[in-house]
């Protein structure tokens, strides 16, 4: 994986589960827990229900479980975990597709969270886009950080967008269709459009604020120089009058 940053997908652990085995807990960041179960009569009804309950545990409206058929396999996915019921021979290729989709969707979700968290503080910074006052100069460092941060968001978005709008070429045809189905159900296209608008607004806000603060700082510097010139001229005029008075 190269975008939005270079990474390797590593199979950290592989365990054969029995029907009475304890199922894995919630995944940590950038980790995907995947359970493969045989299709048909090889997987009992009670075991299948338990696996489906494991998938549903902890889900909410923002992270519902998605279900996508893939040539006879039943694939369920949500952030951090997935369940595949089907042919064990397709385990490797399906695992690759799920890992790639989870990586890109996870970065999309992370960008959504970071920009959403920046929205309310940004409302307090709107005043910096108007004619600033002297006290506003103390927020220059904050504005500079936000300009850098929004630029990094834009760069990450640009690298991420193409991989979510279109499946990576290294996936085979069947897995690419699974990737597309998951992306459609996760409403990736609409989420990308919303994220794009949000980043654009934040970028415009802080770039304009940086310009306003820069202009105000320059104005104050020019004003100091002009007052210094006036003071020098007044001093020269005073000296001239003093010399004239003495003569």
List each model region and its residues:
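Membrane-associated alpha-helical segments
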Residues: 136-236, 242-244
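Extended alpha-helical interaction modules
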Residues: 2-143
